Regions:
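Catalytic cores of carbohydrate-active enzymes across secretory and cytosolic contexts
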Residues: 1-270
Length: 270
């Protein structure tokens, strides 16, 4: 069963563009300087998660195992508990988890952390993320820890580290298909004998894209023998184009690439 929940423009702005991506995303990536907090937006984040819980509740059976994903939905389990559901609920955080000293500087941090206590299992990408989570919760009065189990405020939660990866064998097999080999051969015939540095990322300030361009520029300055030899091709897929900081980083990258090409480029090399 697939259930859809329509969001109003205000919901989208407060919940998604606002608290999710203007507070949680930068804070959880240790960028407090980019966080923009608004009481209206945190209320929108609560409101939409309550709506999700209310829409989901009639569809749940007592035997269902509930698995919730990522920072947009941290309080969802708490609202499901309020609705009377005692199902086992797991949560996986797809992004990093900040150090306690960073998190404590963020508005509503204790409410967010209290929301995690409604889960039975909380999963992280790395052991460092799980350790940051444990260290913060151990500041709660009466919290105890036993290996990967935490008891806090009358709730027991288990944490785990489940790194996400790709299907290496499938990708390797795809690279050796006849179609792939033909495309590679065509590319070799067209390409000049140069060093190609290729990056593929979302257009996001957490990816270090300006730093990458600055590093390439520095390479060309300090080692001019790489001019006309090395080519940097950066593929940056646009994302969250309604969030101001993403508009700014796109402009910064366009200006940087233009400046580098203007300074070092030639008619047959950019």
């Amino acid at each position: 069963t697939i259930a859809t929940v329509p969001l109003s423009k205000k919901d989208y702005e407060d919940y998604y563009l606002g608290f999710s991506n203007s507070v949680i995303w930068p804070v959880f990536h240790n960028r407090l300087d980019l966080a923009k907090f608004s009481a209206t937006q945190v209320e929108g984040y609560r409101r939409v998660n309550i709506e999700f819980a209310n829409r989901l509740s009639p569809l749940l059976r007592p035997s269902d195992l509930i698995w919730i994903h990522d920072y947009h939905l941290i309080p969802l389990a708490a609202h499901l508990r309020v609705n009377g559901h005692r199902n086992p609920i797991g949560f996986f955080l797809h992004i990093s988890f900040p150090t306690p000293d960073v998190l404590v500087a963020a508005p509503e941090h204790e409410w967010l952390m209290d929301s995690f206590l409604s889960y039975d299992l909380v999963g992280f990408q790395t052991a460092l993320d799980a350790d940051n989570f444990h260290r913060f919760l151990l500041n709660f009065e009466g919290t105890s820890q036993s290996e990967n189990k935490l008891v806090a405020r009358g709730r027991t939660i288990v944490t785990g580290v489940f790194p996400i990866g790709i299907d290496v064998e499938a990708f390797a097999a795809m690279a050796h298909t006849q179609e792939a080999e033909e495309r590679i051969e065509r590319l070799h015939r067209r390409a000049t004998p140069r060093v190609h540095i290729i990056g593929v990322d979302r257009l996001d300030y957490t990816k270090g894209l300006p730093e990458r361009l600055h590093a390439f520029r520095r390479l060309l300055e300090l080692h001019p023998e790489n001019r006309k030899v090395a080519t940097l091709m950066q593929i940056a897929a646009p994302t969250r184009e309604d969030v101001e900081i993403y508009v700014e980083i796109r402009k910064e990258l366009e200006q940087l690439s233009g400046a580098i090409n203007g300074e070092f480029g030639d008619f047959d090399w950019t």
